[in-house]
């Protein structure tokens, strides 16, 4: 009987301990669930290129077509001696004096050239400039009053800035405008009046990059390997 009493006492104490432990656990606030970190999306080279072209090829094509229509319109105005005031404004904008120089400035080059430059300058749409600033072509900014972001490098003690655009289309239009009015690309403009061959045109873009003439060779290789001339349409 004595042993049986001790047995019941031990069981009662154990039961009481379990109850007390349960009550303590209820009073403890549960820890917030840990959010699982999502792994960064990893794309193959092929996927990256497809995403780049899906985003940019339609934009480049649309801008090119718009600029070509403007070029043909201005060409008709000059032939007919019309719209002198509008022509004067365009000459001022593009920093030219003569009618032939204006046509050189306005004629757009093939989309294949623009896409090759975009691919190289933005690392197929993965550069910080492309993602954060819609800056497709790595265009620098020298105006502190315009929208821009700091680059990750400097020239001596000076910070390099690149332009920030509201859209990819705004970036593409500014790029065509840059090549149409900068003195650095005068030979390029002269050549595109005589030829629409992208592999010839890129040879005159050596001043766009510190790579100099090797830059044109790389652009030509990008155009050929990725068959970018398929975006040039029947006119090319």
Go through the PLM ranges and name each one.
Residues 2-116, 120-236:
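Catalytic cores of secreted/periplasmic lytic hydrolases that degrade extracellular macromolecules
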